[in-house]
């Protein structure tokens, strides 16, 4: 089990020149969802990441790893009060059988990272262009 620690994401953004530091906010004791967010004065404007690992159950035979990202955008014109004008979300769900190996899980993780860096996926996300 990994300890919930501060996470720093570097080389992010369109030009790869941004850094984001996420601070642990705790683990929900009911559902085991770990929460991290950008330290900010207004909670609604914080960038958030949640991570959870669900164990197999009677109805579901696989482990389910869920990662969610939320990036709110704040109003910055005309000295408005802090408010969220829009948000971008990402929701990634990975599913593994209890028999999967750490090698297989690492392969999926690294394939996903490489896929997100591929020009086809970059164009789809950044420019909202569908594949043809």
Curated annotation (Swiss-Prot):
GO cellular component, one term: T=3 icosahedral viral capsid
Residues in the signal sequence: none
GO annotation, biological process: regulation of translation
Protein name: Capsid protein
Keywords, sorted A to Z: Capsid protein, RNA-binding, T=3 icosahedral capsid protein, Translation regulation, Virion
Top-rank lineage group of the source organism: Viruses
Family to which the UniProt record says this protein belongs: Belongs to the Leviviricetes capsid protein family.
Cellular localization per UniProt: Virion
Quaternary structure, from the entry: Homodimer. The capsid protein dimer binds to the viral RNA via an operator hairpin, but also many other RNA sequences in the viral genome.
Cited Pfam families: Levi_coat (PF01819)
Stored Gene3D superfamilies: MS2 Viral Coat Protein (3.30.380.10)
Main location: virion
Coiled coil stretches, renumbered: none
Single annotated GO MF: structural molecule activity
Species: Enterobacteria phage SP
Role noted for this protein: Capsid protein self-assembles to form an icosahedral capsid with a T=3 symmetry, about 26 nm in diameter, and consisting of 89 capsid proteins dimers (178 capsid proteins). Involved in viral genome encapsidation through the interaction between a capsid protein dimer and the multiple packaging signals present in the RNA genome. Binding of the capsid proteins to the viral RNA induces a conformational change required for efficient T=3 shell formation. The capsid also contains 1 copy of the A2 maturation protein.
